[in-house]
A protein has these predicted regions:
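Cell-wall glycan-active module
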Residues: 7-203, 292-362
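Extracellular, surface-exposed passenger/stalk and repeat segments of large secreted bacterial proteins
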Residues: 10-19, 213, 257, 285, ...
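Short secondary-structure boundary segments
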Residues: 151-157, 213-216, 223
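Solvent-exposed, acidic/flexible segments
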Residues: 156, 185-193, 203, 207, ...
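Catalytic and binding regions of secreted/periplasmic enzymes and modules that target cell-wall glycans
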Residues: 216, 223-349
Protein backbone atom coordinates (compact mmCIF):
# COMPACT_ATOMS: atom_id res chain seq x y z
CA UNK A 1 0.00 0.00 0.00
CA UNK A 2 1.50 3.31 -1.03
CA UNK A 3 0.93 6.99 -0.69
CA UNK A 4 2.46 10.14 -2.08
CA UNK A 5 4.11 8.42 -5.03
CA UNK A 6 2.19 10.33 -7.64
CA UNK A 7 4.70 13.17 -7.37
CA UNK A 8 6.63 13.38 -10.64
CA UNK A 9 10.10 14.82 -10.31
CA UNK A 10 12.23 16.73 -12.78
CA UNK A 11 12.33 15.16 -16.24
CA UNK A 12 15.45 13.12 -16.96
CA UNK A 13 16.73 13.05 -20.56
CA UNK A 14 18.94 9.98 -20.12
CA UNK A 15 17.47 6.52 -19.92
CA UNK A 16 19.04 6.06 -16.51
CA UNK A 17 18.65 8.64 -13.78
CA UNK A 18 21.87 10.24 -12.56
CA UNK A 19 21.66 10.22 -8.80
CA UNK A 20 22.57 13.06 -6.52
CA UNK A 21 25.57 12.68 -4.25
CA UNK A 22 24.60 10.87 -1.08
CA UNK A 23 24.89 12.66 2.27
CA UNK A 24 26.25 9.57 4.02
CA UNK A 25 29.40 7.72 2.96
CA UNK A 26 28.62 4.16 1.91
CA UNK A 27 32.03 2.57 2.46
CA UNK A 28 32.53 1.53 6.06
CA UNK A 29 35.72 0.12 7.54
CA UNK A 30 35.15 -3.41 8.83
CA UNK A 31 36.45 -2.84 12.35
CA UNK A 32 34.78 -4.10 15.52
CA UNK A 33 34.58 -1.55 18.33
CA UNK A 34 35.42 -2.43 21.90
CA UNK A 35 32.81 -1.77 24.57
CA UNK A 36 34.71 1.32 25.69
CA UNK A 37 34.92 2.63 22.15
CA UNK A 38 31.22 2.01 21.67
CA UNK A 39 30.33 3.94 24.83
CA UNK A 40 32.36 6.87 23.55
CA UNK A 41 30.73 6.58 20.14
CA UNK A 42 27.24 6.77 21.68
CA UNK A 43 28.31 9.81 23.68
CA UNK A 44 29.75 11.49 20.59
CA UNK A 45 26.56 10.81 18.66
CA UNK A 46 24.44 12.32 21.42
CA UNK A 47 22.12 9.37 21.98
CA UNK A 48 19.78 9.90 24.96
CA UNK A 49 20.12 7.54 27.93
CA UNK A 50 16.79 5.91 27.01
CA UNK A 51 18.39 4.59 23.79
CA UNK A 52 21.63 3.28 25.23
CA UNK A 53 20.70 0.01 26.91
CA UNK A 54 19.15 -1.37 23.73
CA UNK A 55 22.08 -0.15 21.64
CA UNK A 56 24.52 -1.85 24.01
CA UNK A 57 22.72 -5.16 23.51
CA UNK A 58 22.92 -4.77 19.74
CA UNK A 59 26.60 -3.88 19.92
CA UNK A 60 27.31 -6.92 22.06
CA UNK A 61 25.76 -9.20 19.43
CA UNK A 62 26.99 -7.29 16.36
CA UNK A 63 30.21 -5.39 17.18
CA UNK A 64 30.75 -4.38 13.54
CA UNK A 65 27.52 -2.45 13.30
CA UNK A 66 27.58 1.32 13.59
CA UNK A 67 24.80 3.48 14.97
CA UNK A 68 24.40 7.13 14.03
CA UNK A 69 21.99 9.55 15.70
CA UNK A 70 19.77 11.34 13.20
CA UNK A 71 18.97 14.50 15.14
CA UNK A 72 15.64 15.72 13.82
CA UNK A 73 15.56 18.89 15.91
CA UNK A 74 11.80 18.30 16.22
CA UNK A 75 9.69 18.25 19.36
CA UNK A 76 8.43 14.69 19.87
CA UNK A 77 4.82 15.62 20.66
CA UNK A 78 4.64 17.98 17.69
CA UNK A 79 5.94 15.32 15.32
CA UNK A 80 3.46 12.72 16.61
CA UNK A 81 0.59 15.20 16.33
CA UNK A 82 1.47 16.00 12.72
CA UNK A 83 1.74 12.31 11.79
CA UNK A 84 -1.58 11.63 13.55
CA UNK A 85 -3.63 13.92 11.33
CA UNK A 86 -6.52 11.95 9.88
CA UNK A 87 -5.59 10.04 6.75
CA UNK A 88 -1.81 10.44 7.06
CA UNK A 89 -1.34 7.05 8.74
CA UNK A 90 -3.71 4.12 8.28
CA UNK A 91 -4.19 0.78 10.01
CA UNK A 92 -6.28 -2.32 9.41
CA UNK A 93 -9.88 -2.04 10.59
CA UNK A 94 -9.40 -5.51 12.10
CA UNK A 95 -7.33 -3.95 14.88
CA UNK A 96 -8.84 -3.27 18.30
CA UNK A 97 -10.39 0.13 18.97
CA UNK A 98 -7.33 1.54 20.76
CA UNK A 99 -5.33 1.31 17.54
CA UNK A 100 -7.88 3.26 15.47
CA UNK A 101 -8.65 6.96 15.48
CA UNK A 102 -11.95 8.10 16.95
CA UNK A 103 -11.64 11.66 15.65
CA UNK A 104 -14.83 13.01 14.04
CA UNK A 105 -13.46 12.78 10.51
CA UNK A 106 -12.31 9.19 11.06
CA UNK A 107 -15.08 7.58 13.12
CA UNK A 108 -18.89 7.76 13.19
CA UNK A 109 -19.89 7.50 16.84
CA UNK A 110 -23.57 7.10 15.93
CA UNK A 111 -22.93 3.91 13.98
CA UNK A 112 -19.74 2.73 15.65
CA UNK A 113 -18.06 2.47 12.26
CA UNK A 114 -14.74 3.77 11.01
CA UNK A 115 -14.32 5.67 7.76
CA UNK A 116 -12.37 3.66 5.18
CA UNK A 117 -9.58 5.65 3.53
CA UNK A 118 -8.01 3.03 1.27
CA UNK A 119 -9.18 -0.25 -0.23
CA UNK A 120 -11.92 -1.78 1.90
CA UNK A 121 -10.24 -2.13 5.30
CA UNK A 122 -7.76 0.69 5.92
CA UNK A 123 -8.85 3.27 8.50
CA UNK A 124 -7.11 6.12 10.33
CA UNK A 125 -4.62 5.10 13.01
CA UNK A 126 -5.00 6.48 16.53
CA UNK A 127 -2.46 8.91 17.98
CA UNK A 128 -1.36 6.19 20.41
CA UNK A 129 -0.73 3.80 17.52
CA UNK A 130 1.26 6.42 15.63
CA UNK A 131 3.39 7.16 18.70
CA UNK A 132 4.02 3.44 19.26
CA UNK A 133 5.19 2.80 15.70
CA UNK A 134 7.04 6.11 15.48
CA UNK A 135 9.09 5.82 18.70
CA UNK A 136 12.54 4.58 17.54
CA UNK A 137 13.27 3.05 20.95
CA UNK A 138 10.59 0.40 20.42
CA UNK A 139 12.60 -1.05 17.52
CA UNK A 140 16.18 -1.13 18.80
CA UNK A 141 16.46 -4.91 18.66
CA UNK A 142 17.90 -7.31 16.10
CA UNK A 143 14.46 -8.06 14.68
CA UNK A 144 13.28 -4.58 13.79
CA UNK A 145 16.35 -2.32 13.83
CA UNK A 146 16.61 -2.73 10.05
CA UNK A 147 14.07 0.04 9.56
CA UNK A 148 16.99 2.35 10.38
CA UNK A 149 19.50 0.77 8.00
CA UNK A 150 20.85 3.11 5.36
CA UNK A 151 19.43 2.11 1.99
CA UNK A 152 22.35 2.72 -0.35
CA UNK A 153 23.63 -0.28 -2.37
CA UNK A 154 26.63 -1.95 -0.71
CA UNK A 155 27.98 -4.72 -2.91
CA UNK A 156 30.24 -6.22 -0.24
CA UNK A 157 27.34 -8.01 1.45
CA UNK A 158 24.21 -7.49 -0.65
CA UNK A 159 24.12 -10.56 -2.90
CA UNK A 160 21.89 -12.59 -5.20
CA UNK A 161 21.52 -15.25 -2.52
CA UNK A 162 20.21 -12.62 -0.10
CA UNK A 163 17.69 -11.36 -2.64
CA UNK A 164 16.64 -14.95 -3.33
CA UNK A 165 15.98 -15.41 0.37
CA UNK A 166 13.60 -12.45 0.30
CA UNK A 167 11.90 -13.75 -2.83
CA UNK A 168 11.43 -17.27 -1.46
CA UNK A 169 7.78 -18.24 -1.00
CA UNK A 170 6.74 -15.68 -3.61
CA UNK A 171 5.79 -16.11 -7.29
CA UNK A 172 9.12 -14.47 -8.23
CA UNK A 173 11.44 -17.05 -6.69
CA UNK A 174 13.67 -18.79 -9.25
CA UNK A 175 11.41 -17.49 -12.02
CA UNK A 176 12.17 -15.73 -15.30
CA UNK A 177 10.25 -13.07 -17.18
CA UNK A 178 10.35 -11.83 -20.76
CA UNK A 179 11.31 -8.27 -21.59
CA UNK A 180 12.62 -5.99 -24.31
CA UNK A 181 16.17 -4.70 -23.95
CA UNK A 182 15.90 -0.94 -23.36
CA UNK A 183 18.99 -0.22 -25.48
CA UNK A 184 18.85 -2.74 -28.35
CA UNK A 185 15.16 -3.59 -28.54
CA UNK A 186 16.00 -7.30 -28.51
CA UNK A 187 13.62 -9.77 -26.84
CA UNK A 188 15.25 -11.38 -23.78
CA UNK A 189 14.51 -13.28 -20.59
CA UNK A 190 15.86 -12.65 -17.10
CA UNK A 191 15.49 -14.06 -13.62
CA UNK A 192 13.73 -11.74 -11.19
CA UNK A 193 16.68 -11.95 -8.79
CA UNK A 194 18.98 -10.73 -11.56
CA UNK A 195 16.65 -7.83 -12.28
CA UNK A 196 16.79 -6.70 -8.65
CA UNK A 197 20.59 -6.87 -8.62
CA UNK A 198 20.76 -4.89 -11.86
CA UNK A 199 18.29 -2.37 -10.48
CA UNK A 200 20.51 -1.94 -7.42
CA UNK A 201 23.63 -1.34 -9.49
CA UNK A 202 21.87 1.22 -11.69
CA UNK A 203 19.93 3.06 -8.99
CA UNK A 204 22.48 2.62 -6.15
CA UNK A 205 19.67 1.45 -3.88
CA UNK A 206 19.89 -1.68 -1.73
CA UNK A 207 18.59 -4.76 -3.63
CA UNK A 208 17.32 -6.15 -0.33
CA UNK A 209 15.28 -3.02 0.19
CA UNK A 210 13.93 -3.18 -3.36
CA UNK A 211 12.96 -6.85 -3.13
CA UNK A 212 11.40 -6.38 0.30
CA UNK A 213 9.40 -3.40 -0.97
CA UNK A 214 8.03 -5.38 -3.90
CA UNK A 215 7.18 -8.30 -1.62
CA UNK A 216 5.16 -6.03 0.64
CA UNK A 217 3.51 -4.05 -2.14
CA UNK A 218 2.33 -6.70 -4.61
CA UNK A 219 2.78 -10.25 -3.26
CA UNK A 220 -0.49 -11.66 -1.92
CA UNK A 221 0.56 -15.29 -1.33
CA UNK A 222 3.26 -17.78 -2.27
CA UNK A 223 1.64 -18.20 -5.68
CA UNK A 224 -0.33 -15.00 -6.31
CA UNK A 225 0.26 -11.28 -6.77
CA UNK A 226 -1.67 -8.06 -7.11
CA UNK A 227 -2.96 -7.32 -10.60
CA UNK A 228 -0.45 -4.45 -10.61
CA UNK A 229 2.23 -6.87 -11.88
CA UNK A 230 0.27 -9.22 -14.14
CA UNK A 231 0.00 -6.96 -17.18
CA UNK A 232 -3.61 -8.07 -17.58
CA UNK A 233 -5.66 -5.14 -16.28
CA UNK A 234 -8.04 -4.35 -19.14
CA UNK A 235 -7.75 -0.57 -18.89
CA UNK A 236 -3.92 -0.75 -18.85
CA UNK A 237 -2.99 -3.93 -20.76
CA UNK A 238 0.69 -4.84 -20.75
CA UNK A 239 1.55 -2.35 -17.99
CA UNK A 240 3.40 -3.38 -14.80
CA UNK A 241 3.99 -1.56 -11.49
CA UNK A 242 6.08 -3.64 -9.09
CA UNK A 243 6.48 -0.99 -6.39
CA UNK A 244 2.92 0.37 -6.63
CA UNK A 245 4.35 3.77 -7.48
CA UNK A 246 1.55 6.29 -7.99
CA UNK A 247 -0.96 4.00 -6.27
CA UNK A 248 -2.24 6.80 -4.08
CA UNK A 249 -4.89 6.07 -1.48
CA UNK A 250 -8.34 5.73 -3.04
CA UNK A 251 -10.90 3.07 -3.87
CA UNK A 252 -8.82 2.10 -6.95
CA UNK A 253 -5.14 2.41 -5.94
CA UNK A 254 -3.92 -0.24 -8.41
CA UNK A 255 -5.48 1.63 -11.35
CA UNK A 256 -3.91 4.88 -10.15
CA UNK A 257 -0.52 3.19 -10.09
CA UNK A 258 -0.93 1.63 -13.53
CA UNK A 259 -1.98 4.97 -14.94
CA UNK A 260 1.24 6.49 -13.61
CA UNK A 261 3.30 3.57 -14.95
CA UNK A 262 1.75 3.91 -18.41
CA UNK A 263 2.61 7.59 -18.86
CA UNK A 264 4.29 7.77 -22.28
CA UNK A 265 4.62 11.54 -22.33
CA UNK A 266 6.66 11.73 -19.14
CA UNK A 267 9.38 9.44 -20.46
CA UNK A 268 11.00 9.29 -17.04
CA UNK A 269 12.23 6.25 -15.12
CA UNK A 270 11.96 4.02 -18.23
CA UNK A 271 8.22 4.64 -18.51
CA UNK A 272 5.94 3.36 -19.86
CA UNK A 273 6.55 0.17 -17.89
CA UNK A 274 5.64 -2.35 -20.54
CA UNK A 275 7.51 -5.26 -18.97
CA UNK A 276 8.80 -6.31 -15.52
CA UNK A 277 12.36 -5.12 -16.24
CA UNK A 278 11.28 -1.54 -16.93
CA UNK A 279 9.14 -1.53 -13.81
CA UNK A 280 11.73 -3.08 -11.47
CA UNK A 281 14.66 -0.98 -12.71
CA UNK A 282 12.74 2.21 -13.44
CA UNK A 283 10.90 1.98 -10.14
CA UNK A 284 14.21 1.57 -8.31
CA UNK A 285 15.46 4.74 -10.00
CA UNK A 286 12.34 6.56 -8.86
CA UNK A 287 12.63 5.36 -5.26
CA UNK A 288 16.33 6.15 -5.09
CA UNK A 289 16.22 9.56 -6.75
CA UNK A 290 12.91 10.54 -5.18
CA UNK A 291 13.47 9.30 -1.63
CA UNK A 292 16.98 8.13 -0.79
CA UNK A 293 18.63 11.08 -2.52
CA UNK A 294 16.19 13.46 -0.82
CA UNK A 295 17.42 12.39 2.61
CA UNK A 296 14.72 9.76 3.22
CA UNK A 297 17.39 7.08 3.19
CA UNK A 298 15.95 4.63 5.70
CA UNK A 299 12.64 2.76 5.77
CA UNK A 300 11.73 4.75 8.87
CA UNK A 301 12.20 8.09 7.10
CA UNK A 302 10.29 6.90 4.05
CA UNK A 303 7.40 6.06 6.37
CA UNK A 304 7.70 8.94 8.84
CA UNK A 305 9.19 11.85 6.93
CA UNK A 306 10.78 14.00 9.63
CA UNK A 307 13.44 15.33 7.26
CA UNK A 308 13.46 18.94 6.11
CA UNK A 309 12.23 17.91 2.64
CA UNK A 310 8.41 18.04 2.48
CA UNK A 311 8.23 17.17 6.16
CA UNK A 312 5.21 15.08 7.27
CA UNK A 313 4.27 14.44 3.64
CA UNK A 314 6.01 12.69 0.72
CA UNK A 315 5.66 9.43 2.64
CA UNK A 316 5.96 6.18 0.73
CA UNK A 317 3.27 4.22 2.57
CA UNK A 318 0.15 5.05 4.56
CA UNK A 319 0.29 1.74 6.46
CA UNK A 320 1.54 2.85 9.90
CA UNK A 321 3.13 -0.59 10.43
CA UNK A 322 4.97 -0.66 7.09
CA UNK A 323 8.49 0.17 8.31
CA UNK A 324 8.26 -2.51 11.00
CA UNK A 325 6.90 -5.09 8.54
CA UNK A 326 9.66 -4.41 6.02
CA UNK A 327 12.25 -4.64 8.78
CA UNK A 328 11.09 -8.15 9.65
CA UNK A 329 11.45 -9.21 6.01
CA UNK A 330 14.94 -7.74 5.86
CA UNK A 331 15.87 -9.63 9.03
CA UNK A 332 14.87 -12.89 7.35
CA UNK A 333 16.92 -12.04 4.28
CA UNK A 334 19.99 -11.32 6.41
CA UNK A 335 19.84 -14.55 8.46
CA UNK A 336 23.33 -15.95 8.95
CA UNK A 337 25.01 -13.13 7.05
CA UNK A 338 25.25 -10.26 9.48
CA UNK A 339 27.69 -11.00 12.31
CA UNK A 340 30.62 -9.26 10.65
CA UNK A 341 28.83 -7.07 8.13
CA UNK A 342 29.52 -3.33 8.39
CA UNK A 343 25.93 -2.14 8.51
CA UNK A 344 25.22 1.47 9.36
CA UNK A 345 22.00 2.51 11.07
CA UNK A 346 20.67 6.07 11.23
CA UNK A 347 18.33 6.36 14.21
CA UNK A 348 16.10 9.42 14.73
CA UNK A 349 16.35 11.37 17.96
CA UNK A 350 13.67 13.90 18.90
CA UNK A 351 13.58 16.75 21.38
CA UNK A 352 11.60 16.37 24.62
CA UNK A 353 11.00 12.64 24.30
CA UNK A 354 9.28 10.91 27.24
CA UNK A 355 11.60 8.98 29.56
CA UNK A 356 9.85 5.70 28.78
CA UNK A 357 9.12 4.16 25.39
CA UNK A 358 5.71 4.93 23.88
CA UNK A 359 3.49 1.99 24.94
CA UNK A 360 1.46 -0.35 22.78
CA UNK A 361 -2.17 0.88 22.55
CA UNK A 362 -4.54 -0.96 24.91
Amino acid sequence: MSRGLGDVYKRQNAKYVKLAKKPVTKKVAVVAMSDAQFEQAMKNEGFPESYKQSLRALHSAYPYWQFKAYKTGLDWNTAVTEESKTGVNLISNARAKAWKSTEKDAYDASTGKWKVFDGSTWVAASKAAVAYFMDPRNYLNDRSVYMFELLEYQSQYQTKSGVNTILSNTPFYNKKFSYTDVNTGAAKTMYYVTAFMEAAKISKASPYHLASRVKQEVVTSATTTSTAVTGTVSSYPGIYNFYNIGATSSSTPVLNGLKWASDKKAGTYLRPWTDPYRSIVGGAQYISSGYIAKGQNTCYLEKFNVTSYKRYSHQYMTNVEAAYEESIKTKKAYAGMMDKSPLVFSIPVYENMPAANSPMPK
